[in-house]
Amino acid sequence: MALRLEDKKAIVAEVNEAAKGALSAVAADSRGVTVGAMTGLRKKAREAGVYVRVVRNTLARRAVEGTAFECLAETFTGPTLIAFSLEHPGAAARLLKDFAKEQANFEVKGAAFEGNFIPAAEIDRLAKLPTYEEALAQLMMTMKEASAGKFVRTLAALRDQKQEAA
């Protein structure tokens, strides 16, 4: 079904707004995936703070023009699903990577983060980024381990002092 010019402009504006507020983007080919599976993906995406849209390639190219995700334009061939992470940079990559494991026909084409293109083979780099809470927990564990090590060294020095005095 042909889209009217006003509809096309609205789609480009909507996707462009999502791109401007996004932290990262992932492009994928959803050909052969059932409607039920796509509905489940969209539900998970909403819960994870990811904007997902199936867009015509020409409209997708125009929507990302002038944004940090312009490097994705070369991946817009065939049926294109584009996902923008709005809350966490790795959310869309993690979501689509997990979905690709479940669906044999689903293929991730590539991702973009801070203006850099990430090929599909290296999508794990983006998907494995820790969330804010995970990063805080890692920092706290590092600080805790450092203070424990300092405490152990202090006790060892105190023991050495007492042995020398005795």
Curated annotation (Swiss-Prot):
Keyword rRNA-binding recorded: yes
GO cellular component entries: large ribosomal subunit
Molecular function via GO: large ribosomal subunit rRNA binding; structural constituent of ribosome
Keywords on record: Ribonucleoprotein, Ribosomal protein, RNA-binding, rRNA-binding
One biological process term in Gene Ontology: translation
Subunit and partners: Part of the ribosomal stalk of the 50S ribosomal subunit. The N-terminus interacts with L11 and the large rRNA to form the base of the stalk. The C-terminus forms an elongated spine to which L12 dimers bind in a sequential fashion forming a multimeric L10(L12)X complex.
Entry similarity comment: Belongs to the universal ribosomal protein uL10 family.
HAMAP family: Ribosomal_uL10
Name assigned to this protein: Large ribosomal subunit protein uL10
Species this protein is from: Shewanella sp. (strain W3-18-1)
Classification of source organism: Bacteria, Pseudomonadati, Pseudomonadota, Gammaproteobacteria, Alteromonadales
